[in-house]
Amino acid sequence: MALLNRRWTGCVLGVAMFVGWTAAISADAVHNDGHEFDFEFGTWKTHVSMLKQPLTGSKTWAEYDGITIVHKVWNGQANLVDLDMKNASSHLKLASFRLFNPATHQWSLYVANSHSGTLGVPSIGGFADGRGVFYDKETFDGKLVTVRFVITPRSADAIHFEQAFSADDGKTWETNWIADDTRVKDR
């Protein structure tokens, strides 16, 4: 089970093998300016639901609670996310480094976890119509899958995240990661 958790957290947010796949959101379709994540800076209470066995038909989820801290870097042109979450049987730490590319007007989201100690390849995309959508390709359980990661701000104090895998190049999707963040207000 520990090996499964290490392997799963290593790929859960798009951290496995990138296969030169271009994001579905092109630079022409989305004109980001490098401040799309400004709404997220600060500390958040996080609840995560993670599908235990993606792409198997399983409906068994693991639930985690934790804290996310989002730090501004380079005046907002980058940011660092520190997620620390646990449940009764597992403790997971993830870090995400998000970089804005001014030439393409897209963001690259790199993720690492404390179990593997490695930085994965990026999910690439941007924000349009009030939500961020990011894509990559990676290998999961020996199969090449398309990964979609969606960030939806619901208010100034609430954000919803979803990750889904597609084993058929985006025809169908299975959501395998759901996170809801609530801002921790200064006292």
Regions found by a protein language model. Name each.
Residues 4, 18, 25-26:
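Short stretches within intrinsically disordered, low-complexity N-terminal or propeptide regions
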Residues 24-187:
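Hydrophobic small-molecule pocket/channel-lining residues, especially in calycin-type beta-barrels
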Residues 1-12:
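Bacterial N-terminal signal peptides that target proteins for export
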Residues 11-21:
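Bacterial N-terminal signal peptides
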